[in-house]
């Protein structure tokens, strides 16, 4: 069975490092301060944070998972309104769990149907991973089109992270490597972390390269400070989290939206039992992605 067939089958049935501990196994602290993972959008946690989440859970750490943005996406609504599935037009490799169920006639505002459905997938994924708490910032995904929009979003994210750092002293904070990920929402989250590190608010910070799965397998670890080799038992759980994004179950508000958003990333993350942890670059440059 090919990895694409495995992903389809699973979907149809399923549902700056600061410190010196990066290269050592995660150990629970005496105070059991939480490890807080930040997912810019619904699906990032399943793609590139899940193995690290499970590593911390296995070490006895409480794990809190934050959804940063609402994930509005008008193009995703348009995809779900097309029939047949646009993923299969000229490319039959993508096993879309919503096959035969397209043409939904959803409004294309990108929010009214998309946000609750994407968030339902996120919550199902979080449940599969067994996180101890889910926190939803409920920020509009709005760092685009101007520098003002971008920095307004950075400030909003920064304020919310700062509040969590105050609420949970001693927590570690895990972000995505936004400077590598070609998406302003991801970059803005990394910028917020960078500013808070410089202010001394965050002292234990790591960055997982979620979009590494776009690269050839041999290049995904390039520049990483640490490569997590995910144990097979944890990888099975990570795959269950991925399947939550390719499940057709309208009664649970699951419409396989994550798979329609990033099918290639999901296929690659499903197949590669590794995650890639980075430190923030010494010459880090804040600001939006230069396209």
PLM region spans:
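N-terminal export signals
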Residues: 5-25
């Amino acid at each position: 069975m090919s990895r694409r067939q495995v992903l389809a089958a699973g979907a149809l049935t399923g549902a700056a490092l600061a410190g010196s501990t990066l290269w050592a196994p995660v150990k629970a602290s005496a105070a059991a301060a939480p490890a807080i993972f930040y997912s810019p959008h619904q699906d990032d946690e399943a793609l590139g944070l899940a193995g690290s989440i499970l590593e911390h859970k296995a070490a006895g750490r409480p794990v809190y998972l934050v959804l940063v943005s609402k994930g509005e996406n008008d193009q995703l609504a348009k995809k779900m309104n097309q029939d047949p599935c646009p993923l299969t037009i000229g490319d039959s490799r993508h096993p879309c769990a919503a096959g035969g169920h397209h043409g939904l006639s959803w409004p294309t505002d990108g929010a009214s149907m998309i946000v609750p459905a994407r968030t339902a997938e996120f919550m199902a994924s979080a449940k599969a991973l067994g996180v101890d708490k889910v926190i939803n910032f409920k920020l509009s995904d709005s760092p685009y089109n101007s520098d003002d929009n971008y920095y307004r979003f950075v400030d909003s994210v920064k304020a919310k992270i700062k509040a969590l750092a105050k609420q949970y002293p001693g927590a570690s904070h895990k972000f995505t490597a936004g400077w590598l990920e070609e998406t302003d929402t991801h970059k803005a989250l990394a910028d917020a972390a960078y500013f808070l590190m410089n202010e001394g608010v965050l002292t234990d910070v790591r960055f997982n390269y979620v979009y590494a799965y776009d690269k050839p397998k041999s290049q995904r670890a390039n520049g990483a400070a640490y490569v997590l080799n995910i144990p097979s038992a944890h990888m099975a759980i990570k795959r269950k989290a991925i399947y939550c994004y390719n499940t057709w179950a309208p009664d649970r508000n699951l419409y396989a939206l994550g798979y329609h958003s990033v099918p290639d990333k999901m296929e690659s993350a499903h197949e590669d039992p590794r995650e890639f942890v980075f430190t923030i670059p010494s010459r880090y440059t804040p600001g939006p992605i230069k396209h």
